[in-house]
């Protein structure tokens, strides 16, 4: 089923648990669609939603969805920027190197103007991006050693962006 629909049902059936997507692919959904879905779950959960985004993998995006998997890191960066602008401002015009939106308007006011965004990452560059622009990193299937090195890459990205690594 659809992760946002399932999370909305969970939101209506619970009161305290935090709800998150783990990873919603920035290739499979457009940035405005992600922002609308996130705002909807956040509304029905009364602010308990955490948005997890990532590029997914070429072996899923291309054969399973019929889309071209290219420039995943840039696509993630632009998607995060568009999602944040929509949540904050309610509308967006955006010209990026990948995402181009003439104008998109929510036509509603989100419950929160800022929803925490976590990014999925496996390799060093994407882990650094997590530190630069996200509230945290989503890593799976890793050893303790990989988790430690991943944390260092996230911290490097945070420092490069002028952020406190302890806040990521």
Regions found by a protein language model. Name each.
Residues 1-168:
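Active-site-adjacent structural elements that line small-molecule/cofactor binding pockets in enzymes
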